[in-house]
From Swiss-Prot:
Signal peptide: none annotated. The keyword ATP-binding applies. The gene is hisS. It comes from Fusobacterium nucleatum subsp. nucleatum (strain ATCC 25586 / DSM 15643 / BCRC 10681 / CIP 101130 / JCM 8532 / KCTC 2640 / LMG 13131 / VPI 4355). Its main location: cytoplasm. One of its GO terms (molecular function) is ATP binding. Its EC number is 6.1.1.21. It is found in: Cytoplasm. This is Histidine--tRNA ligase.
């Protein structure tokens, strides 16, 4: 019978990868909650219209990458390709704006895009992100960027660069859009097929061209910063000022526009040179118009998302691996029940314990304990059982001592 395998573009997270995933998730939870963010979980599928209106019908995500299907009720359903639109829907549907002036949320979950699978980019991938609703202050933009940078730094990831830009408002982008089209139309013959298609439909994405972006006529394109209105320019300048206060170094990148249409004002990416062409580790920005587009509510918002798989590729070997604190080695028929009671007693005191229920010799037990990288091994043989003691071996000091069973917890804690 043919073995059924995981679908192309998906993968199991097991072994060391699973340990990395748990570590990243735990660091995110602790850090985000320290900043006052609350966890929220949204469904992995939504009405297709949410993403068409939220992300933008002219984006690559909506045009080429969404997993969309009809359910048995003939409704068009899409597996979420990103989570911001879903969080906006959740925020509006549950009228959270009526309960609190400012809302801070974070999330962690699977997203789905039909892309060519490659290192760090799968068709099912995991994202961690956060969003702030109800606050327009540039201080919040700077805080969100700072949290993203410090999160990656906390994970031990180095060689990071923060890139920032402003894409203005719909009004200022309209003026800039015309100047951009005018500039690129004189270079149509030298542009890639995607850019020729985008020039009238989504001209800002021309700045993000991965094929010809290094050519001189791309580099000489007008900068959106020169077309920002006075209040938009002040907001951008204030974001930079508060980034300085947060101690975050940054580079201004006038070609940075992000790939989703809902962004306005501040946009940013955190990049590294360690991932080749997939250099962006984390990205986000402000999307003050999205809540009006999806729910007719004039509520500002800002946030970011990061791909967990890409972070996993960057993690060094010195991350905490969630290994058991204690391995229990029991020897002989009469010791297993007592060993089990010892294990439960330790677990009740928040001590991580591994116990193997199959009979083994001492050599096999030691080999297993070494592989699990536990600090302690509790050895319970027939002699120890009869005396009411155990042998406690500390692998970090190589010391071994006899202790009473009821005193194990005091020695280990």
């Amino acid at each position: 019978m043919k073995l059924i395998k995981a679908v192309r573009g998906t993968k199991d997270i097991i072994g060391e990868e699973a340990k990395k995933y748990i570590y990243i998730s735990n660091v995110a939870q602790k850090m985000f909650e320290n900043y006052g963010y609350n966890f929220v979980k949204t469904p992995i599928f939504e009405e297709t219209e949410l993403f068409k209106r939220g992300i933008g019908e002219a984006t690559d995500v909506v045009e080429k990458e969404m997993y969309t299907f009809k359910d048995r009720g003939d409704r068009s359903i899409t597996l979420r390709p990103e989570n911001t639109a879903s969080l906006v829907r959740c925020y509006l549907e549950n009228a959270i704006y009526a309960k609190e002036e400012i809302s801070r949320f974070y999330y962690n979950g699977s997203m789905f895009r039909y892309e060519r699978p490659q290192a760090g980019r799968q068709r099912e991938f995991n994202q961690i992100g956060l969003e702030v609703f109800g606050e327009k202050s540039p201080k919040v933009d700077a805080e969100v960027i700072a949290i993203g940078y410090k999160f990656l730094e906390k994970l031990g990831i180095t060689d990071l660069e923060v890139k920032i830009n402003s894409v203005g408002s719909k009004a200022s982008r309209t003026v800039y859009r015309e100047k951009l089209i005018e500039h690129f139309k004189s270079h149509l013959d030298d542009m890639c097929e995607d850019c020729r298609d985008r020039i009238n439909r989504n001209p800002l994405r021309l700045l993000d061209c991965k094929v010809d972006g290094e050519k001189d006529f791309y580099k000489s394109a007008p900068s959106i910063i020169d077309y920002l209105f006075e209040d938009e320019r002040k907001h951008y300048d204030d974001v930079k000022k508060y980034l300085d206060i947060f101690g975050i170094k940054y580079t201004e990148d006038p070609t940075l526009v992000r790939g989703l249409d809902y962004y306005s004002s501040t946009v940013f990416e955190i990049v590294t040179n360690k991932l080749g062409s997939q250099g962006t580790v984390l990205g986000g920005g402000r999307y003050d118009n999205l809540l009006k587009e999806l729910g007719d509510k004039d509520i500002p918002a800002v946030g970011f998302a990061t791909g967990v798989e890409r972070i996993m590729m960057l993690l060094e070997e010195n991350y905490p691996k969630n290994t058991p604190d204690v391995y229990i080695a029991w020897l002989g028929e009469n010791t297993s029940e007592t060993a089990l009671k010892i294990a439960e007693s330790l677990r009740d005191n928040d001590i991580k314990v591994y116990i193997d229920y199959s009979e083994k010799g001492m050599k096999s037990h030691m080999k297993k304990a070494d592989k699990l990288e536990t600090r302690y091994c509790v050895i319970l043989g027939e002699d120890e059982f009869n005396k009411g003691i155990v042998l406690l071996k500390d692998f970090s000091t190589r010391e071994q001592k006899e202790i009473k069973i009821e005193e194990i917890i005091n020695y280990i804690k």
